[in-house]
């Protein structure tokens, strides 16, 4: 109350920002007559002078210089836009551009021209000479926006590229990223970052810097998709029959007898009766013994798949595959899979082909990817409801930009019915009334299942209509564009079609504009506001209203008791509804509860990912050092050798150079032979003044002699590549261990321990082990590298050039996989893990290992003895 009164007196924080920006708008507008008089060449030259001014100062002063040249830059960009695009930036769009340049989120209503607004901040920040990324939610918008704005950028002397999933060639991607301005989707940018950190050459890395990014539909990308990490992964061998068996067991279990469902937290709890039944059906005496951990995990996922996830709501089945439906957009999430075996459980449930589970090779959340940028900003029509999260997680403030024209849309109170049937009957009557009148209507549903229900009812009433859900996603833009035609009836799942304007003719405006009907409140108020926002663009008339029932998930789970009590007191008959601000407020309170749950969930995910992120940054930084041709890796190898030997000597009891028994010396001799491929006579160890110094010098000399066959450049490249391979393999195993740690860490809570604190402690210890393992494994591998003296440089080059990077769509969340050349991969594995005597020899001879390289070592190649 007090806050509201103060706000009215001195204005809100948002009001004060807008007031400051309006002063700068005046400065920009005063420059307009000057630039209008210039020829195209003069205008372009003026812009080039601004670029030179920005690039001439030190990097840490460039941001300050951008603010100084902002009025001129914005004025020139606006004038260029008028000439090239025949579009003029309104004053409110200039404000939006300044908000973006300040690293904030510009909340701009639908139809206010966000695509054009972005050009102001993009053109200004590209002056620094580093690529500016414009991030969109799908390939269609990335391609459309870049092509529409490209003539303007070209006029200003900038190059433009677009990264989409269809760009498969690495050289082409490298070329696109070299452009001044790059448009693309959040997935493509994120995956390219991960792929960059699997490359074996700095020149092949596509993302050279993370200077400035503008995220369109920022709420969708940074909020809705924040819980879905990007993962590059490889297959893990699991027995496929376990999924089917777990599915059979799950389907035989009864709700409230064998398990209970917690809908609020989307969890399933197995009862004692359920555990006994499962043990009997699996044929085990204790489901939770360590050897049965896989079975219990499969059962948990099978229960979730059968009782918490529903076809045509959470996923669809198409082409013998289970395809996820994005809960926020209603779009199909092609290539994305549920993790931890849930997707396989769904495949078993639906009787389609079961694909392998996978091991994480590289991963990152959108939260940590976008927080890498020196400056980040965003645009959306709906951000204020999530302003706290944007500020806490991303340090992004939200500024609501005034509309160019006043909003004329009428947002009516919700209508609430007792049952879903009564609600849909009322919706059909309203649609029929509007259709007969000729007024277009857009109907929003919460799932494919509900859109199909409405489709059947409209078909029965013979009302022509179009359905837009995940099954028709390829026609999305065309369907949404036509939603404003006379008599059009369009059913859309959630807010599929974001980014596409629904334009109205004068005739439609006379009829009252686009009528929005929401058939269910979403868990997030923001999604509801997006649906409303499809109507009333740029001062157009329009109406929005939600039709709800007590059987809707939101009201049933979170908030219907109070509303149900009101309806019972009123004694409403079948088909009657209640409509009041009190009820609408109760619904919004229920939504706030859910929003808070989701916020805490995303925050919780980030707290865990922050732990891994610090480790990821350390590993990737070291990786870049190894890729640098100027990095002296010989120093690192010498350090590793010293460390590995210290580890060995520290384990020898009572070690003080000469107090080792003959047995201990023999043990040391065997270790040096087995781990480092170094032969030292026992008598030499016995006679050495300092065993430690003697062994260290021997290992060093042996290694130097082995590497004489190579020139310095070849040696450096091979050492770096082999070290990178060791690092990558160790990092992948570390990620696998971290995944397992995270999976079971919440159980620590039962022991009165904070799972997050425990996770931080154990992951830190695991990281220390990772560093130690890399050092020891590196020196073991390097000690076994050998070139035959007669081997020429072309042979070495052949091995070096055999590194190929292949991208494949795999079977986990947004998965792509990259593979190294099998020959070198296998060669490294030969000596990092010695084969058993009766296993096939890895050299490819076809003989058993004991009859081949176990005797004499590999006959050829990098690792020949």
From Swiss-Prot:
Its cofactor is Zn(2+). PROSITE patterns: SECA (PS01312), SECA_MOTOR_DEAD (PS51196). It catalyses: ATP + H2O + cellular proteinSide 1 = ADP + phosphate + cellular proteinSide 2. ATP binds at residues 93, 111-115, 501. Zn(2+) binds at residues 841, 843, 852-853. One of its GO terms (cellular component) is plasma membrane. One of its GO terms (biological process) is intracellular protein transmembrane transport. InterPro entries: Helicase_ATP-bd, Helicase_C-like, P-loop_NTPase, SEC_C_motif, SecA, SecA_CS, SecA_DEAD, SecA_motor_DEAD. It is an enzyme of class 7 (translocase). Transmembrane segments: none annotated. It is a peripheral membrane protein. SMART domains: SecA_DEAD, SecA_PP_bind. May bind 1 zinc ion per subunit. Keywords: ATP-binding, Cell inner membrane, Cell membrane, Cytoplasm, Membrane, Metal-binding, Nucleotide-binding, Protein transport, Translocase, Translocation, Transport, Zinc. Its EC number is 7.4.2.8. It comes from the Bacteria. It is found in: Cell inner membrane; Cytoplasm. One of its GO terms (molecular function) is ATP binding. The keyword Zinc applies. The keyword DNA damage does not apply. Part of the Sec protein translocase complex. Interacts with the SecYEG preprotein conducting channel. Has a central role in coupling the hydrolysis of ATP to the transfer of proteins into and across the cell membrane, serving as an ATP-driven molecular motor driving the stepwise translocation of polypeptide chains across the membrane. Monomer and homodimer. Part of the essential Sec protein translocation apparatus which comprises SecA, SecYEG and auxiliary proteins SecDF-YajC and YidC. PANTHER family: CHLOROPLAST PROTEIN-TRANSPORTING ATPASE, SECA INNER MEMBRANE COMPONENT OF SEC PROTEIN SECRETION SYSTEM. Belongs to the SecA family. This is Protein translocase subunit SecA. The lineage of its organism: Bacteria, Pseudomonadati, Campylobacterota, Epsilonproteobacteria, Campylobacterales.
């Amino acid at each position: 109350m007090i806050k509201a009164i103060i706000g009215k007196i001195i204005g809100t924080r948002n009001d004060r920002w807008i007031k400051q920006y309006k002063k700068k708008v005046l400065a920009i507008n005063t420059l307009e007559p000057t630039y209008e008089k210039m020829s195209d060449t003069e205008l372009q030259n003026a812009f080039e002078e601004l670029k030179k001014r920005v690039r001439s100062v030190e990097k840490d002063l460039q941001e300050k210089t951008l603010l100084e040249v902002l009025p001129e830059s914005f004025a020139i960009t606006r004038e260029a836009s008028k000439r090239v695009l025949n579009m003029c930036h309104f004053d409110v769009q200039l404000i939006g551009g300044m908000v973006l340049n300040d690293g904030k989120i510009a909340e701009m209503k639908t139809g206010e021209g966000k695509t054009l607004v972005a050009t102001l901040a993009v053109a200004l920040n590209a002056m620094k000479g580093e690529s500016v990324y414009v991030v969109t939610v799908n390939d269609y918008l990335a391609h459309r926006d870049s092509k529409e704005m490209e003539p303007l950028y070209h006029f200003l002397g900038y190059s433009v590229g677009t990264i989409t999933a269809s760009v498969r060639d690495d050289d082409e991607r490298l070329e696109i990223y070299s452009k001044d301005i790059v448009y693309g989707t959040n997935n493509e940018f994120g995956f390219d970052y991960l792929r960059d950190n699997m490359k074996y050459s700095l020149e092949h890395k596509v993302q050279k810097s993370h200077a400035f990014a503008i995220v369109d539909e920022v709420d969708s990308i940074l909020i809705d998709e924040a819980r879905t990490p990007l993962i590059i992964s490889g297959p893990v061998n699991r027995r496929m029959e376990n999924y089917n068996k777990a599915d059979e067991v799950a389907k035989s279990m009864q709700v409230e007898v064998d398990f209970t469902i917690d809908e609020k937290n989307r969890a399933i709890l197995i009862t004692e009766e359920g555990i006994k039944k499962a043990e009997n059906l699996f044929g085990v005496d204790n489901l939770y013994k360590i050897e049965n951990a896989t079975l219990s995990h499969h059962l948990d996922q099978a229960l979730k798949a059968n009782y918490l996830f529903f076809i045509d709501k959470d996923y669809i089945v198409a082409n013998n595959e289970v395809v996820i439906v994005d809960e926020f957009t209603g779009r199909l999430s092609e290539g994305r899979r549920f993790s931890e075996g849930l997707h396989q459980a769904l495949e078993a449930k639906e009787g389609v082909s079961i694909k392998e589970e996978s091991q994480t090779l590289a991963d990152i959340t959108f939260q940590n990817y976008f927080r890498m940028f020196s400056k980040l900003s965003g645009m959306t029509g709906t951000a204020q409801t999530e302003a706290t999260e944007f500020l806490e997680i991303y340090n992004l403030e939200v500024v609501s930009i005034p509309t160019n024209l006043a909003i004329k849309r009428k947002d009516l109170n919700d209508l609430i019915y007792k049952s879903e049937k009564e609600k849909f009957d009322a919706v059909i009557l309203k649609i029929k009334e509007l259709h007969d009148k000729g007024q277009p209507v857009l109907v929003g549903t919460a799932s494919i299942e509900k859109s199909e229900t409405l489709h059947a009812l409209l078909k029965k009433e013979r009302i022509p209509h179009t359905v837009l859900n995940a099954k028709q996603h390829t026609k999305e833009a065309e369907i949404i564009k036509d939603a404003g035609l006379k008599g059009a009836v369009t059913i859309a799942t959630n807010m599929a079609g974001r980014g596409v304007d629904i334009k109205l003719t004068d005739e439609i405006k006379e009829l009252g504009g686009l009528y929005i009907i929401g058939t269910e409140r979403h868990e997030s108020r923001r999604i509801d506001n997006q649906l409303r926002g499809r109507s009333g663009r740029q001062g157009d008339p329009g109406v929005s209203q939600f039709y709800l029932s007590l059987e809707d998930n939101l009201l049933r789970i979170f908030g219907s008791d109070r509303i149900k009590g009101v309806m019972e007191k009123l004694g409403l008959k079948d088909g009657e509804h209640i409509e009041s601000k009190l009820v609408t407020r109760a619904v919004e309170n229920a939504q706030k509860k859910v929003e808070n749950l989701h916020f805490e969930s995303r925050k919780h995910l980030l707290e865990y990912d922050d732990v891994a992120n610090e480790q990821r940054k350390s590993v990737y930084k070291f990786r870049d050092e190894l890729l640098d041709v100027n990095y002296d890796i010989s120093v690192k190898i010498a350090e590793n050798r010293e460390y590995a030997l210290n580890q060995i000597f520290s384990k020898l009891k009572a070690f003080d150079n000469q107090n080792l028994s003959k047995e201990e010396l023999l043990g040391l001799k065997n270790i040096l032979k087995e781990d480092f491929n170094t032969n030292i006579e026992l008598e030499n160890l016995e006679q050495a003044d300092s065993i430690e110094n003697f062994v260290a010098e021997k290992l060093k000399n042996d290694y130097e002699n082995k590497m004489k066959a190579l020139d310095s450049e070849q040696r450096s490249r091979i050492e770096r590549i082999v070290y990178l391979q060791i690092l990558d393999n160790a990092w992948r195993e570390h990620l696998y261990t971290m995944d397992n740690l995270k999976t079971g860490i919440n159980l620590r809570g039962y022991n009165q321990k904070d799972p997050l604190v425990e996770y931080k402690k154990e992951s830190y210890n695991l990281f220390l082990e990772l560093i130690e393992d890399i050092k020891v494994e590196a020196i073991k591998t390097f000690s076994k590298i050998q070139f035959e003296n007669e081997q020429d440089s072309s042979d070495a080059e052949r091995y070096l050039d055999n590194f190929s990077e292949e991208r494949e769509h795999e079977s986990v969340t947004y998965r792509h996989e990259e593979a190294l050349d099998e020959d070198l991969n296998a060669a490294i594995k030969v000596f990092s893990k010695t084969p058993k005597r009766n296993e096939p020899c890895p050299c490819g001879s076809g003989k058993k290992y004991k009859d081949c390289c176990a005797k004499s070592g590999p006959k050829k190649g990098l690792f020949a003895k």
